[in-house]
Amino acid sequence: MKRTAIEAAKKAILAWLDDADPFRTHGPHVPAKIRRELGLEKAVFDQAVMELLQARKIYCAPHDHPHRLPEAERAELVADGRGVFYCSISDRRPARPLPAEAIPA
């Protein structure tokens, strides 16, 4: 797996979060949806997510019982390679300020 592909995937994931949820009000997000919309290979996506998690840019919720899922469903989760599977992604970066018209008077 090329480092450049992982770095590009990390940027794409953060850009997707910025576009989909700029005010950080709609998370958590489903990893498989993000991966499909970005057209990323699973291995590259999973590694990029793990690096963003380690850098504390995102939060990922671990699935409580991933091995009870059918293999096809488990394959949709983010795998850390050590037996932990993540079922959601939330942005930990600061939100953009709300527009003035969105704030009640």
List each model region and its residues.
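Short helix-coil junctions and helix-kink-helix linkers
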Residues: P31-K42
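A generic structural-conservation signal
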Residues: V44, A61-P62
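Long, low-complexity, charge-rich intrinsically disordered regions
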Residues: E51, R56, P62-A105
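Short amphipathic alpha-helical interaction segments
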Residues: L40-E51
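Positively charged, polyanion-binding regions of nucleic-acid-associated proteins
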Residues: T4-G27, P31-A32, V49
